[in-house]
Design a protein with these regions (language model features):
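Extreme N-terminal segment that seeds HTH/winged-HTH DNA-binding domains in transcriptional regulators
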Residues: 1-34
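Conserved phosphate-binding catalytic cores of ATP/NTP-utilizing and phosphoryl-transfer enzymes
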Residues: 58-80, 185-210
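Gly/Thr-rich phosphate-binding beta-strand-loop-beta motif of the actin/hexokinase/Hsp70
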Residues: 67-106, 210-223
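Glycine-rich phosphate-binding loop and adjoining helix at the ATP-binding site
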Residues: 103, 107-123, 127-207
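A mobile "lid/hinge" subdomain adjacent to the ATP/sugar-phosphate binding pocket shared
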Residues: 256-285
């Protein structure tokens, strides 16, 4: 039994009930009480609160041969939306998703050439996606930005060779966007976010390794149900591990880095050289 103040216990129980409805959708009040070990009175009170907040919907009765048919509860995944942004070297991509992570819209823009234009471009992108949320109860409830760099204690750092137009380490995007929209804004390494997404929506495992390969290479890890980033956030920065001593020259100044053999540009170059066709594209593979 959870001990503590009534408010804390209520909050924890409310969270547990909502999570169970999300994971077992649809579900009856009776089954919620049985699965969570809570009294029917507690379940009824919490469910009524969630119904009042429009986070849960009653969607009809369960089929049963005996007794009163239980009313089924379903998570209202359209009650709010989130925006996920991938801040790439040349393209900024955004996805608008409902509260279950199902995509409602995708958009992309060119990455601005000048850092001072980045905030304005992001605001324009976000505002262009707000229209689809007009009928939802809570609208946009959060924004997440994935970057191709390291995030540690909200501080952003990049490898020294990253081009200046993608360096947003001197822009306080979290503060700027939170002041504009009054909702939580998060910034994290894109591979870490991929790992979190895989763990949250698709995986039944407590340990996950998610490898992202594009112009660079990075690794996101969930270990024992927790995102693992290392002491300084560099745990997944594997692109500049030397795998071939005295190998190909890398933009970081070393030789034989993993990115020189497995990143998309390096794979395309190898493919172009092999088929004797300059500037091969991904579509050619």
């Amino acid at each position: 039994m959870i001990r503590g103040s009534k408010e804390l216990i209520r909050s924890i129980n409310c969270t547990n009930v909502l999570e169970e409805i999300i994971n077992s959708d649809p579900i009856s009040r009776a089954y919620l009480a049985k699965k969570l070990g809570l009294t029917k009175a507690t379940i009824s009170s919490i469910v009524q609160e969630l119904l009042n907040r429009k986070l849960v919907l009653e969607i009809g009765s369960d089929e049963t041969k005996f007794g009163r048919k239980p009313i089924l509860l379903s998570f209202n995944q359209k009650a709010g939306y989130a925006i996920s942004i991938d801040f790439g070297d040349t393209i900024i991509s955004a996805a608008l998703t409902d509260l279950k992570g199902e995509a409602a819209q995708y958009k992309s823009i060119q990455t601005p050439d000048e850092p001072q234009k980045i905030l304005e471009s992001l605001v324009d992108l976000i505002q262009s996606m707000e229209q689809l949320t007009a009928t939802s109860i809570y609208g946009i409830v959060g924004i997440t930005i994935g970057i191709h760099g390291v995030v540690h204690r909200k501080k952003i750092t990049y490898e020294k060779h990253v081009s200046s137009n993608t360096d947003i380490s001197n822009i306080d995007l979290i503060n700027e966007l939170e002041q504009l929209y009054h909702i939580p804004v998060f910034i994290e390494n894109e591979a870490n976010l991929s790992a979190i997404g895989e763990y949250t929506f698709k995986s039944t495992y407590e340990n996950i390794a998610n490898l992202n390969i594009h112009n660079s290479i990075s690794l996101g890890m969930v270990l024992h149900n927790t995102l693992y980033t290392g002491n300084n956030g560099y745990a997944g920065s594997i692109g500049h591990m030397i795998v071939v001593p005295d190998g190909r020259t890398c933009s970081c100044g070393n030789h034989g880095c993993l990115e020189q053999y497995l990143s998309i540009p390096s794979l395309l170059k190898d493919f172009s050289d092999k088929i004797h066709v300059p500037d091969a594209k991904l579509a050619d593979l």
